[in-house]
């Protein structure tokens, strides 16, 4: 048995190892006869030997007709395929894997594999290649890499441009009435709930989401102002105002100028509010002092007239006290005399004229003293 059949059956026979030289010297199979008709059905896979040439596919028969698929492929793909499938690229082993013996017969082999595995179309060369061919393959591969890198850069730039081209949102222009209502609501609560936002939307005729965005921006502005004036803007302004009042320092012109647009729009609204209140309080105090000064002369004149018209009524407290003490003593003496007279049983004698006059004077003094006490009460 000679040829491929002998080489295929040689490993199965015991005690007869296959020499490498025999496999290398085996002639290629004869070409088919000109008169033979090709079989219409699929050809079963042929058993090949395990020699070096069979494994590498060097004994493959050339195709009987030229393939047109090679012309349809672009030049860049062919150059890249030649550089990959060349012995310098894969070490001369790739053709055996892509050859007819490397793929089983029950798999449909693609046309581009057959074209690329054809040694005549790819023009495989031995390891020693000409320097001109190496340069051309390297330049072709570098050109293809440059094209792919440029395509990637273009795709990245287009993606970045599409990201940057965002839809511009419509900017809401608030009226003075809307701003005033929003500021009032912000002073009441920095974080209004959904119900408060809906009520504010009905009042200002603004959408609820616009009101929510406005409150977010207003809170950010408020935090920025807090950082500018300290941890708490109200306490910082209060301390500043106290120091200015204590040392009689006037307000800076910048704060006064910012108050022209409105207290809430100024850089220190609480400080300006306190300054305004202090000015109003000072003006009210000045008015009260002027009214009191105008009323004081009238009171002085009235007192003088009253004192001048009735000088007898101007009695000191000491005189009243002395009169009251004397009246009490007189009453005590009368009581004592009456008691003594009743005890002794003596008939009361008639008083003389001098004694009657003295008693009358005492009674008049008592009556006058009682009248004075009533007036004082």
Curated annotation (Swiss-Prot):
Summary of the tissues where the protein is detected: Retina and spinal cord.
InterPro entries xrefs: CVC (IPR023339), HD (IPR001356), Homeobox_CS (IPR017970), Homeodomain-like_sf (IPR009057), OAR_dom (IPR003654), VSX_homeobox_regulators (IPR052294)
DNA-binding region positions on the chain: 167-226
Subcellular locations according to the entry: Nucleus
Gene: VSX2
One Pfam family per UniProt: OAR
Protein name as catalogued: Visual system homeobox 2
Function: Acts as a transcriptional regulator. Plays a significant role in the specification and morphogenesis of the sensory retina. Mediates differentiation of V2a interneurons by repression of motor neuron gene transcription, via competitively binding to response elements that are activated by the ISL1-LHX3 complex. May also participate in the development of the cells of the inner nuclear layer, particularly bipolar cells.
Xref: CDD domains: homeodomain (cd00086)
